[in-house]
């Protein structure tokens, strides 16, 4: 009826073309962003369903909309899988992101004017725990934990002193440069003394927690875990809240999600999360183990080749992430931009001694291996990657040479691993003809 309405088709096709070029960019590049991953084919399929067009306000079987018969079953199953994977009493698959999950928990546990203790931004703390993020938006007063650069972790004695002196209502943990487990057990007496609620932002390490390769926050003193679902947990860009808390607190958390911080919860992404949780129960331990092997091996090789890899005292990392000081190589911005031109995608990053004002040109870069592990990289492949990084950053070999080598390395990996089915990664899924 409206077939003649094509005045702006060229604009729509332009956007499609840019999306296809984006897919090609990642098909021909080595992805090392620590906060990204690639989904399985079955999880991707969920994003294309009619679920993405529907609403389901409220909790399963108590909705404000009709048409949720199958949505309720999907949400119940996703919740069941989440509780099983994380061995938790409760699980909420509705948050739209990790920050949304954080906001919901802050809404539940705090009032404006309350005090919260958080990791410092330059020590890897996430922006949602900063004054200009969700914490500030809630009107909370922040106090930061001291950071031990040699340990690349919060300073235990200093943090105990901070908690006892400042008496925060909530002690918040978790980082976006998360190299080593948080010493929750060592801080437990301090939590108890001031009667603080303990929340652990596990966005970056959720897949490692689920796979038994990092720490178990709920057994080490945390009451609630928040997180996104698309980093070491290789699902959709979505969020989750995991808890072993009392029923009254959990009801507040659920109200913090809806109606507190969202209306609809993107049902297609929730279904994709459910598929991802099932795959993690089957494949997650092997995946997490290889992630940590690859990260530690890459750290060792980069250090051997002359990079200033932080955390050397403790084996560089216990997670998927490495932090590297490249201040002698032009700084984080220059190195990240040059590597992007060479077909290697990572990000510049603040290091503990950097001023937060220098976030656009910090000392460091952040490297994550979870996505290359997802497509099949093993230790020998990581060694070759380290050689390419050395020649690009330290030896400053021509961009064209580095790009050729990076593309050749990447071209060997043509399947998404640790999941059901087979699919070539970075394939554009075409529906419109």
Curated annotation (Swiss-Prot):
Subunit-level organization: Homodimer.
Annotated site residue numbers, Plays an important role in substrate specificity: 230
UniProt keyword annotation of Nucleotide-binding present: no
Gene Ontology CC annotation, any one: cytoplasm
PANTHER family: SERINE HYDROXYMETHYLTRANSFERASE (PTHR11680), SERINE HYDROXYMETHYLTRANSFERASE 1 (PTHR11680:SF35)
Alphabetic keyword roster: Amino-acid biosynthesis, Cytoplasm, One-carbon metabolism, Pyridoxal phosphate, Transferase
One Gene Ontology term of the molecular function aspect: pyridoxal phosphate binding
SUPFAM superfamilies: PLP-dependent transferases
Name this protein carries in UniProt: Serine hydroxymethyltransferase
Root EC class: transferase
Pathway the protein takes part in: Amino-acid biosynthesis; glycine biosynthesis; glycine from L-serine: step 1/1
Residue numbers bearing the N6-(pyridoxal phosphate)lysine modification: 231
Gene Ontology terms: biological process: glycine biosynthetic process from serine; tetrahydrofolate interconversion
Described function: Catalyzes the reversible interconversion of serine and glycine with a modified folate serving as the one-carbon carrier. Also exhibits a pteridine-independent aldolase activity toward beta-hydroxyamino acids, producing glycine and aldehydes, via a retro-aldol mechanism.
Co-factor(s): pyridoxal 5'-phosphate
PROSITE patterns linked to this entry: SHMT
CDD domains documented for this protein: SHMT
Subcellular compartments: Cytoplasm
Cystines in this chain: none
Entry EC no(s): 2.1.2.-
Similarity comment: family membership: Belongs to the SHMT family.
Residue positions binding (6S)-5,6,7,8-tetrahydrofolate: 121, 125-127
């Amino acid at each position: 009826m409206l077939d003649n309405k094509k005045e702006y088709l060229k604009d729509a096709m332009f956007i499609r073309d840019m999306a296809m070029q984006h897919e090609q960019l990642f098909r021909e590049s080595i992805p090392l962003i620590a906060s990204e991953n690639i989904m399985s084919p079955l999880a991707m399929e969920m994003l294309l369903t009619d679920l993405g067009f529907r609403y389901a306000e409220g909790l399963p079987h108590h909705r404000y909309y009709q048409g949720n018969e199958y949505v309720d079953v999907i949400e119940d199953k996703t919740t069941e899988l989440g509780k099983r994977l994380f061995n938790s009493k409760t699980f909420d698959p509705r948050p739209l992101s990790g920050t949304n999950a954080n906001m919901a928990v802050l809404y539940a546990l705090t009032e404006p004017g309350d005090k919260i203790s958080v990791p410092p931004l330059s020590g890897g703390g996430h922006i949602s725990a900063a004054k200009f993020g969700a914490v500030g938006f809630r009107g909370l007063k922040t106090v930061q934990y001291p950071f031990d650069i040699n340990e690349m972790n919060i300073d235990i004695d200093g943090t105990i002193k901070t908690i006892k002196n400042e008496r925060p209502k909530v002690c918040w943990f978790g980082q976006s440069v998360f190299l080593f487990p948080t010493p929750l057990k060592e801080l437990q007496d301090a939590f108890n003394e001031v009667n603080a609620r303990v929340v652990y932002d596990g966005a970056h390490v959720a897949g490692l927690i689920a796979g038994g390769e990092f720490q178990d926050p709920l057994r080490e003193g945390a009451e609630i875990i928040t997180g996104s679902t698309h980093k070491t947990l290789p699902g959709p860009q979505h969020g989750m809240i995991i808890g072993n808390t009392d029923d009254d607190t959990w009801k507040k958390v659920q109200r913090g999600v809806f109606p507190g911080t969202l209306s609809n919860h993107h049902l297609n992404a929730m279904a994709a999360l459910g598929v991802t949780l099932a795959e993690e129960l089957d494949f997650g331990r092997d995946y997490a183990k290889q992630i940590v092997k690859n990260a530690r091996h890459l750290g060792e090789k980069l250090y051997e080749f002359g990079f200033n890899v932080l955390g050397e005292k403790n084996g560089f990392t216990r997670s998927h992430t490495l932090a590297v000081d490249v201040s002698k190589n032009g700084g984080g911005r220059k190195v990240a931009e040059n590597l992007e031109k060479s077909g290697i995608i990572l990000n510049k990053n603040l290091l503990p001694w950097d001023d937060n004002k220098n976030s656009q040109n910090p000392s460091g870069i952040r490297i994550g291996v979870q996505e290359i592990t997802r497509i099949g990289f093993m230790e020998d492949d990581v060694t070759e990657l380290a050689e390419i990084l050395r020649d690009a950053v330290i030896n400053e070999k021509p961009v064209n040479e580095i790009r050729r080598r990076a593309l050749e390395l990447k071209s060997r990996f043509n399947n998404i691993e640790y999941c059901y089915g087979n699919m070539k990664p970075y394939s554009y899924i075409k529906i419109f003809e």
